[in-house]
Swiss-Prot record:
Name of the protein: Small ribosomal subunit protein mS40
One GO term of the biological process aspect: mitochondrial translation
Location(s), subcellular: Mitochondrion
Gene for this chain: MRPS18B
Keyword Flavoprotein recorded: no
Length: 258
């Protein structure tokens, strides 16, 4: 009875209750406009490592030896994956902002480990001592971000001479490759150059037919001074005159004309 009376009053006076629930219950305005309380369980920031500037000192500390001993940092690490076959690639990164993924990789789980080209003891743990090949990421379990940093740091350490690597020695063979194949041997001269003939056939002298010569003689009769013959073997050399002599001859020419 009381609920029906309340519903009638709410219908007749709608301006008193602008917000009503599903069952005609008035909702206070303050409840809808208040902000959510701040989250108290926010993640704390990642602490700064004391070995950030000198990361090689951490591998000589007592804390590191108590944690890992003489084994590599990835020796006891096991990946979490679905199924019996692990994926061929590890995760992209373990730390995104302040959020750390579950079961982080061997480097990301220890905040005092820093990948640096001067940290030779750490880099040697990810390089095969017999072949000098860098271990793959699925073998060590590091994420792809740290694996990329390790590859760059190892290459930089080798360039600076901090990390030794094997260079295979190749003995020269007895076979001389410069004459064993036509593609790498010396190019032989052209047959025409060996015989002394010109490179192109139209450069060589060809005697015109006698019928054509007689026709030209009749056509240019009285204008021919000498008959044509084969070209000389070498062009005559013109003596070079000094610039002083050339100017003197040019000056003497107009004077003689006058």
């Amino acid at each position: 009875m009381a609920a029906s009376v309340l519903n009638v009053l709410l219908r007749r006076l709608p301006y008193f209750s602008p917000f009503r629930g599903a069952y005609g219950v008035q909702v206070p305005l303050q409840t809808l406009c208040t902000k959510a309380p701040p989250e108290d369980d926010s993640l704390p920031p990642i602490p700064v490592s004391p070995y950030e500037d000198e990361p090689w000192k951490y591998l000589d500390s007592e804390e590191y030896h108590n944690r890992n001993g003489s084994r590599p940092v990835w020796a006891d690490y096991r990946r979490n994956h679905k199924g019996g076959i692990p994926p061929q690639r590890t995760r992209k990164m373990c730390i995104r902002g302040n959020k750390v993924a579950g079961n982080p990789c061997p480097i990301c789980r220890d905040q005092k480990l820093h990948v640096d080209f001067r940290n030779v003891k750490l880099l040697k743990q990810f390089v095969c001592a017999h072949t000098g090949i860098i271990f793959h990421a699925p073998y060590t379990g590091v994420c792809m971000k740290q694996h990329k940093k390790l590859t760059q740091a190892i290459q930089k350490a080798r360039d600076h001479g901090l990390l030794s690597y094997h260079i295979p020695q190749v003995e020269p063979r007895d076979l001389d490759f410069s004459t064993s194949h036509g593609a790498v041997s010396a190019t032989p001269p052209a047959p025409t150059l060996v015989s002394g003939d010109p490179w192109y056939p139209w450069y060589s002298w060809k005697q015109p037919p006698e019928r054509e010569l007689s026709r030209l003689r009749r056509l240019y009769q009285g204008h021919l001074r000498e008959e044509s013959g084969p070209p000389p073997e070498s062009m005559p050399k013109v003596p070079l005159t000094a610039p002083n002599e050339a100017t003197s001859t040019e000056q003497a020419g107009p004077q003689s004309a006058l």
